[in-house]
């Protein structure tokens, strides 16, 4: 939300000092700077007329409570509309707004050229979003994106499950083998006697 609001309040020739209680807008003439494709300077040149206005927004655009931003869509809409009007009308004489439409303001196609080259803000495009990453985004009641203990247990679950599965299937295989051997020896008495002699009467100790 902070970055979105900052983008709404930032232009090439507008310096925003604060967006919480008020905004101080400074603008100065940039004679041909935007027209020539150059960047607007951060400090005015000598002899440049400076215009300073203090814009009061009343209550804060957003409030900070319990580690979360509270977004008011109505205030965002009003701010976007007001700021769009300010950034097109509050400027020093000769300020070019990033292009050269002021240099031919008396031309017949001035309004058309102005609308074509300006990036107008649509308040409907302002989204309500929380200042957290998309992948770990959580509701505002959660103080942290993810509990580290919960994350550790979540990672250990597959390992613990694999160990239990191996133990279970090993025991099952051993029991199945013992059952098969006993049934096979009972069905073959001669083989059962020979097996007994080998394992008990003549143990394989050598």
UniProtKB/Swiss-Prot annotation:
Q: Where is the composition biased (Basic and acidic residues)?
A: 103-123
Where does the chain cross the membrane? 150-166
The alphabetized UniProt keywords are: Membrane, Transmembrane, Transmembrane helix
Q: Does the keyword rRNA-binding apply?
A: no
| Low complexity composition-biased segments | 82-96
Question: Where is it predominantly found?
Answer: membrane
Q: Where is this region: Disordered?
A: 81-132
Give the membrane topology.
Single-pass membrane protein
As for subcellular location, the record says: Membrane
Per the record, its GO cellular-component terms are: membrane
Q: What is this protein called?
A: Uncharacterized transmembrane protein DDB_G0283731
Q: Which organism is it from?
A: Dictyostelium discoideum (Social amoeba)
